[in-house]
UniProtKB/Swiss-Prot annotation:
Gene: pyrD
Active site: S173 (nucleophile)
Protein name, entry field: Dihydroorotate dehydrogenase (quinone)
DNA-binding as UniProt keyword: no
Cellular component annotations (GO), alphabetically ordered: cytoplasm; plasma membrane
Cofactor binding, per record: Binds 1 FMN per subunit.
Organism ancestry: Bacteria, Pseudomonadati, Pseudomonadota, Alphaproteobacteria, Rhodobacterales
Annotated HAMAP family: DHO_dh_type2
The organism's place on the tree of life at top rank: Bacteria
Cofactors named for this entry: FMN
Subunit structure: Monomer.
Subcellular location: Cell membrane
Species for this entry: Cereibacter sphaeroides (strain KD131 / KCTC 12085) (Rhodobacter sphaeroides)
Enzyme Commission number, as recorded: 1.3.5.2
Length: 354
């Protein structure tokens, strides 16, 4: 991290977390933030569920919820971006305060509740984005007051799919009441059938991923793997934030919401490895949760991920983190004799299954 980035983070950390979040997006949009540019190599370039990525380090949904800073983020060293979640209608989300830094734990807790500008506005921004080598996907959500949340996911995809490179069905946010109930076998099967029917009508392929929670039993994971394999989706994103609070030291540790960051790394990686085992490599996995270094990205890949995503670590290490991780990952692949990311996927899975 350079001096300018460190100074900017210090200033942001003196502010309310949600205001700092908004200010960081404004700074990106205005061109005030020095950006590292694209990062790729023959080892880093990879294909995940039909997506051709310059590198496997992606931006998780939740940072640029409303797709307002895409041009800048495409120059920040990420291999792919995910915006949203978008819901059919705009909604304000939960009351503030709803975002908390857990500095001692290198973590955050949020209870945003799918606050966003709505599918129509976000779709328009996706349509206007610059085209380039960095795929941009949309996280699909449901309105809090919707009488048919499963239909909401299909509706957002129908509206925005033509302007997105991929889509992620988010049934795992802990901040919308009973949303996680849609991870059950029957509900998930019906939901994915509706989404895939919409996808089948597109003129070009739009890979659909499913984002799951880290707080699932082994039986739940087995059911999800079975449904996912049968549904025709492109892959699984593992995982969203957790409701667990094990070992936290921060004063905000008991705030309601989803916990992200360093404390999630082990839990989410174990879920990832188990899914890799259950799907036997037949379904690409994207590893999310606690990635803050090249070594942690590499561990996720060796546990079974074809790519990774990050967000919370940027709160503590700045916008240049993705590029640093991608370059470090390239060096680790070279060190261990892997000619590509794909060659390394799952080679350390057994370490996470004990």
């Amino acid at each position: 991290m350079n001096i300018l980035e460190r100074a900017a983070l210090t200033a942001l950390h003196r502010m309310d977390p949600e205001k700092a979040h908004s200010l960081s997006l404004s700074a990106l949009r205005s061109g005030l933030v020095p950006l590292p540019g694209p990062v790729t190599s023959s080892r880093l370039a990879t294909d995940v569920g039909g997506l051709v990525l310059p590198n496997p380090v992606g931006l998780a949904a939740g940072y640029d919820k409303n797709a307002v800073a895409l041009a800048a983020l495409m120059r920040a060293g990420f291999g792919f971006l995910e915006v949203g979640a978008a819901t059919p209608r705009p909604q304000p989300g939960n009351p503030q305060p709803r975002l908390f830094r857990l500095t001692e734990d290198r973590a955050a807790i949020n209870r945003f509740g799918f606050n966003n500008d709505g599918a129509a506005t976000i779709c328009a921004r996706l349509a206007m984005r610059p085209r380039g080598a960095v795929p941009v996907g949309l996280n699909l959500g449901a309105n809090k007051d919707s009488p048919d949340r499963a239909a909401d996911f299909a509706a957002v995809l129908a509206a925005c799919g033509p302007h997105a490179d991929f889509a992620t069905v988010n049934v795992s946010s802990p901040n919308t009441e009973r949303l996680r109930d849609l991870q059950g076998r029957q509900a998930l099967t019906a939901l994915l059938e509706g989404v895939m029917q919409v996808q089948a009508g597109f003129a070009r392929p739009v890979p659909v991923f499913l984002k799951i929670a880290p707080d699932l039993s082994d039986a739940d994971l087995a059911e999800i793997a079975e449904v996912a394999l049968a549904s025709g989706i492109a892959g699984i994103v593992a995982t969203n934030t957790t409701l667990a609070r094990d070992g936290l030291r921060s004063a905000h540790a008991r705030e309601t919401g989803g916990l992200s960051g360093a404390p999630l790394f082990e839990r989410s990686t174990r879920v990832l490895a188990r899914l890799s085992e259950l799907t036997e490599g037949r379904l690409p996995l994207i590893g999310v949760g606690g990635v803050a270094s090249a070594e942690e990205a590499y561990a996720k890949i060796r546990a079974g991920a074809s790519a990774v995503q990050l967000y919370t670590a940027m709160v503590y290490q700045g916008i240049g983190l993705a590029a640093r991780i991608a370059r470090g990952l390239d060096a680790l692949l070279l060190r261990d004799g892997f000619g590509s990311v794909a060659e390394a996927v799952g080679t350390g899975r057994a370490d996470w299954l004990t």
